[in-house]
């Protein structure tokens, strides 16, 4: 995915993106962002989906190891790709049920993957648009490397849909890098990688990586409250949120 010509064409427009705040996809291809580019280009859409599946593999183990899913009941993976992450969660927590939501073209291969993982009977696959709504009734909603793809307005729109679905006792888990407020001296390799990804999101989708304060602010805009941030052994953190009016013990 990273070495595909489409990436290099858009990254060549970095100066334009930094100067205007607009995506290279809009400048080069006349599409708002890379996601619409994926929909219009079947070849690159397949490359992107395969790349995101690999990315899910690299983060799923770290997420499962760092978070206690045992009391969630129903886990809804919003923008969950072809199901690698929800499969890993369900394998590690046999008592849970899952729902996988992503675009119909993305989840087309999910039933086979879930069957191979031995969890197909415990996971419903839903082809849909997270901007139109998300399935209700979950105890835990996960968005992994989803929110960083969007600007604040679109991120809040997705989070608001999750808030409507989550009820008063559910939780939301964002699997994302968390940038430091400031960097003094030489940044660590992880921070350097996160900052590079921040630029990548600007170029490709108009999204961005965010600090703890920025997560707190746009969660509040969606009637959610930042509960805690959990470190993992991988490159991402777990940003856990609850309904704004929930008690600390919810």
Which residues does each predicted region cover?
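Conserved Class I S-adenosyl-L-methionine-dependent methyltransferase catalytic core
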Residues: 1-74
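Alpha-helical subdomain
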Residues: 65, 69-250
